[in-house]
């Protein structure tokens, strides 16, 4: 990664632990549309209890980190314009289901619209929300193209990475899973 600035879209059970871990090595902007959630995080309070207070406070920064080499930290915001300098976007919004157990894609579509507004040539978008096979290409990519005016696999790139955590599981955290993976696959 050449001067990455990572955006995490959705700071819930999946997004916040990932943002905290990445912020130990990279500049990270954590975006959540809920102002109350962001305000609590800015104080170092995680109401989901997924991230320990001391670990969260170690990486929090009160200002949006710049792309200066070596700068790290997590800036939490509910202002979409704070995503403008990011070049990697990881979408971790929830995908609830309706009463018939069909996925409600509204959060995913809204997140794709937000990302599309700030997408630039060469950027990478990774979806980590739980979705059915083909959803990324069928639902998300067209929104990114329409909003950004860019062309998928030509101007920007998209990937899918399934969730790597089990909310509430303090033993199998993102950091522990990555550590074990790197030890097994150097």
Residue ranges and their predicted role:
Residues 97-164:
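Rossmann-like NAD(P)(H) cofactor-binding subdomain of soluble oxidoreductases
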Residues 2-4, 27, 33-88, 94-102, ...:
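Conserved N-terminal Rossmann-fold NAD(P) cofactor-binding segment
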Residues 22:
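Aromatic pocket-lining residues of Rossmann-like dinucleotide-binding sites
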Residues 130-131, 141-143, 166-186:
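Short beta-strand and adjoining strand-loop segment in the mid-core
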Residues 11-12:
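Glycine-rich Rossmann-fold phosphate-binding loop(s) that bind the pyrophosphate
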Residues 81-83, 118, 173:
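Structural alpha-helical scaffold elements that stabilize or flank donor/cofactor-binding regions
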Residues 15-16:
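N-terminal Rossmann-fold NAD(P) dinucleotide-binding loop
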